[in-house]
Amino acid sequence: MLEIDNLFVSYGQSEVLHGVGFSAARNETVAIMGRNGMGKTTLFKALVGMLPATRGSMRVDGVDVSGDESWRRVAKGIGYVPQGRQIFSTLTVEENIRTGLEHAASQRVPDDIYALFPVLFDMRKRRGGNLSGGQQQQLAIARALATDPKVLLLDEPTEGIQPSVVKDIARALNEIRKVREIAIVVSEQVLSFALDVADRLFVIEGGRFVHESTRDAGDAGRIREYLSV
């Protein structure tokens, strides 16, 4: 579903991603783990087209999107939830979700979105700025799902969110994968969350992958060492 091969990204003359490559299959969740400044957000910005890659390729469902602008990547199946819960604070919950339906045939919010996030249905007429941080994150995910993506990218979705809501988000992502049958890629620092949602885990350090394992491989201790250095 998502294939990244030998991706290089630079800021000016400084190379920050060095030949990164991974894949995420349909109905699979992949976690990119790493400390701050190791390249997670840079990678995600490159995947969504906000930063140009100097080399490498990206394919979504077999289609090469390497040279596409962000909006074209969205049209071809990329959904993106950026770091920091970026929602429209003056719009209602329902209006926020509908911004993801701008080019859809119908402006009706898909039923499964409210089924995945019941709290958003209860608050659908409330302004986004009046929601808690956890509710805003659920809203950001719901808006990305409204585009009916084939691949959902989430950059540090648990940042600044209370533990009880983190568990709700983990349950929702597992349900999204099952119901929508999409590929999900998350960047994370919280290992417990990654182990709850991910089939495979990568550790990025200095713009390179330095570790890869499956959830069942029992490598949690090794990954924790990378995150605590």
Predicted segments with their positions:
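A short, proline-enriched helix->beta-strand linker immediately N-terminal to the Walker B motif
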Residues: 146-150
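Helix-to-loop junction immediately C-terminal to a conserved catalytic motif
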Residues: 48
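ABC ATPase signature
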Residues: 91, 131, 144-145
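Conserved ABC transporter NBD signature motif
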Residues: 56-64, 76, 106-110, 115, ...
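Helical segment within the ABC ATPase nucleotide-binding domain
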Residues: 167-180
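ABC ATPase NBD coupling module
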Residues: 52, 64-85, 110, 122-126, ...
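The feature captures the beta-strand-to-loop junction immediately N-terminal to the Walker
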Residues: 33-35
